[in-house]
Swiss-Prot record:
Single annotated GO MF: RNA folding chaperone
Subunit structure, interactors included: Interacts with gpa1.
Protein origin, superkingdom: Eukaryota
Extent of the WD repeats: 44-83, 105-145, 150-194, 207-247, 252-292, 296-337
Any one cellular-component term (Gene Ontology): cytosol
Official protein name in the record: Guanine nucleotide-binding protein negative regulator 1
Subcellular localization: Cytoplasm
Length: 399
């Protein structure tokens, strides 16, 4: 554990250990992954956070790191509120660590998870060329495995997972189809597969083409599922993904949909995509055109950036410049830099599902510098790609 979580002592002042904005709030808890060694690529063992998600009961954070580990952190809220001399380092509250054998594509909390019910302490994880696994982080055991098999009889990973609100099914996205696995029976094969594109979809139905990249269930109708694809298309399905597709549209910017978020009233859908500086807003009651775009997102990256709603008609999102921004309707009303002196991508901003005044913020990357190789002849000198360490943190903010 000491090797996994190293305090970045010489950069504490840069890593936001005090109030940075009276509007957004302040850091009350933090886990820093950081080192200050110097090494030459391509060997890159240094660790940093990729993303994080609150559990449905708001008690635990599940985070993904560069070493392909999923870590469950039980957030000590009572200790956070008592800490007055800076944010509490809650790295000792690691309750479970799962090491994936391959690159993690996606993960999702069990929708009925409650910390005081050990049988419900589950999350699903999908990795490259591996079955989808259902893990109980209390017992540390693999409760079940679910198989997505391609035409060559090989396991496939899913880029998006979503439990239905009743906890009965796990939905997994695939290319031109999505699969439903029954959690209660534990059957390894999908009990239903919905084809979204191809000859099995009649010409009079909407067709959703591409590798499915993200899901989002409507908060006002738990059976309405929004599906995004890496082909820049979004589809709306009733009954948790059954055909026919009710609506389908193409986003105007970006290089593949990476995140979908419904507004509180379930009428507008926020769409984030790769390599796009704008978050698009669509009204599903009238999808002929995009309603408006949230300008200044700073999302020009292939990295998946997870954003969230905050209060009515407000959205919080990180960017590649190390800042978190708040929009009210389509107006940018607040901007807070959270990564110190470094322009790092803030990959996750998520409100606690029980108390929206508490936010989870996640960022991290390697820090690079370039030096000339003096051993080469002067006319053939080359620049060495060196990384000097990592700057990364998983933080809990309070308004």
């Amino acid at each position: 554990m000491d090797n996994c979580v190293n305090s970045f002592e010489d950069q504490k002042d840069d890593l936001v250990h005090k109030k940075k904005s009276q509007n957004f709030g302040y850091v009350c808890g933090s886990i820093n992954l950081g080192t200050n060694v110097i090494a030459q690529s391509p060997t890159k063992p240094l660790n940093f956070f990729h993303s994080s998600r609150w559990s449905p009961d708001g008690s635990t954070i599940l985070s993904l790191t560069e070493d392909q580990c999923l870590n469950c952190w039980n957030v000590p809220f009572s200790d956070l509120s008592k800490k007055a001399d800076g944010p509490l380092n809650f790295s000792k509250h690691l309750s479970y660590k799962y090491q994936s054998p391959e690159t993690v594509y996606s993960y999702s909390w069990y929708s009925r998870m409650k910390l005081d019910d050990p049988s419900s302490n589950l999350f699903a994880v999908s990795s490259r060329d591996q079955p989808i696994k259902l893990i109980n982080f209390t017992t540390g055991k693999n409760k079940a495995s679910y198989h997505m098999i391609d035409h060559q009889e090989r396991y496939q990973g899913s880029h998006c997972l979503q439990f239905t609100n009743d906890g009965e099914y796990l939905i997994a996205g695939d290319k031109n189809c999505l699969h439903h696995f029954n959690i209660r029976t534990g059957c390894k094969e999908p009990v239903m597969t919905t084809v979204t594109h191809g000859y099995k979809v009649p010409l009079w139905e909407f067709s959703l083409k591409g590798i499915q990249s993200c899901f989002s269930l409507n908060p006002m109708d738990s059976k309405t599922l929004a599906v995004g694809t890496y082909s820049n298309r979004v589809g709306i399905y009733n009954d948790c993904g059954r055909r026919p597709c009710q609506l389908e549209f193409s986003i105007e910017r970006g290089n593949g949909v990476t995140h979908l978020q419904w507004c509180e009233d379930g009428e507008k859908l926020y769409v984030g995509s790769r390599c796009s500086d704008k978050i698009e807003v669509w009204d599903i009651r009238y999808v002929r055109d995009m309603v408006y775009a949230l300008e200044g997102h700073r999302g020009d990256t292939n990295q998946r950036i997870l954003f969230d709603t905050d209060k009515k008609d407000e959205i919080l999102a990180g960017g590649t410049d190390g800042s978190i921004r708040r929009w009210r309707n389509k107006d940018l009303v607040e901007e807070t830099h959270v990564t110190g002196n470094y322009d790092l991508t803030v990959n996750t901003v998520q409100a606690n599902p029980i108390n929206m005044q508490i936010k989870c913020v996640c960022y991290g990357n390697r820090i690079y510098k370039y030096e000339k190789d003096e051993s080469e002849e002067e006319d053939e000198s080359k620049e060495k790609d060196l990384w000097t360490g990592t700057v990364s943190a998983l933080q809990v903010w309070m308004d």
